[in-house]
Regions:
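Detector for C-terminal structural segments
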Residues: 1-25, 61-70, 90-194
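Surface-exposed patches in mature extracellular/periplasmic domains of secreted proteins
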Residues: 1-2, 37-42, 81-84, 159
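Immediate post-signal peptide segment of exported/extracytoplasmic ligand-binding proteins
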Residues: 22-52
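Short, well-ordered beta-strand elements
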Residues: 48-57, 80-83
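Early extracytoplasmic/lumenal segment of secretory-pathway proteins
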Residues: 79-92
């Protein structure tokens, strides 16, 4: 639906931006010169169209989600590899573009700063924004910095919405789902509100 959960401050629905359309995907890949080889995998200039994605170990069902992505992308001629390893390995490998090209991740916070902490080049830098210690998208960093700098809540909300639009327009992210949260409380607990 968007870069942040629908319950997060500043959320904006990215309606129509993420449509499942395998036929259009095939057309776009054809236009870019990625043609199916004998095994159905697309190639261009002798290079196979394949990527490696991390397993988000702390997230339930990450492996199953990636398996489903592998299945769906294989149908259009794209190979997805799952990066093996524990959480420390996944985090280290995710900072190396040669090991992981697509990052499966999420952060469970609902404040305005979560969007900055996720994608700013000096925070988590989930986009690998500048793999050689440079900032690949200075405009994005500037937009994210504004979220943390603005004093008025309405201004911060507007900036968070602009960042979501930008992340979508640049195709930097692909929201898959909003992870459900389950709370268990004992009968003697009163007044609990998630």
């Amino acid at each position: 639906t968007s870069a942040i959960a629908h319950t997060a401050l500043g959320y904006r629905e990215q309606e129509g931006a993420y449509t499942h359309d395998p036929e259009r995907a095939r057309e776009l890949l054809d236009e870019l010169g990625w043609v199916p080889g004998p095994d159905g995998i697309r190639t261009r200039d002798g290079e196979r169209l394949e990527f490696t994605i991390n397993e988000a170990v702390p997230q339930p069902r990450s492996r199953e989600i990636i398996t489903k992505i592998q299945e769906q992308l294989r149908r259009i001629g794209v190979v997805i590899h799952l990066n093996p390893g524990d959480n420390a390995t996944q985090n280290a490998d995710s900072k190396d573009y040669h090991k992981i090209q697509i990052r499966h991740t999420m952060v469970g916070r609902a404040d305005y700063d979560v969007i900055k902490s996720m994608w700013h080049s000096t925070n988590r830098n989930e986009l690998l924004n500048g793999s050689d210690d440079t900032v690949h998208d200075q405009h994005l960093d500037d937009m994210l910095h504004q979220i943390a700098s603005l004093a008025e809540e309405a201004d911060r909300a507007a900036q968070a919405r602009e960042v979501q639009d930008y992340l979508t327009e640049q195709a930097y992210i692909l929201p898959l789902f909003e992870e459900p949260v389950v709370y268990g409380v004992q009968p003697h607990v009163h007044g609990f509100q998630p």
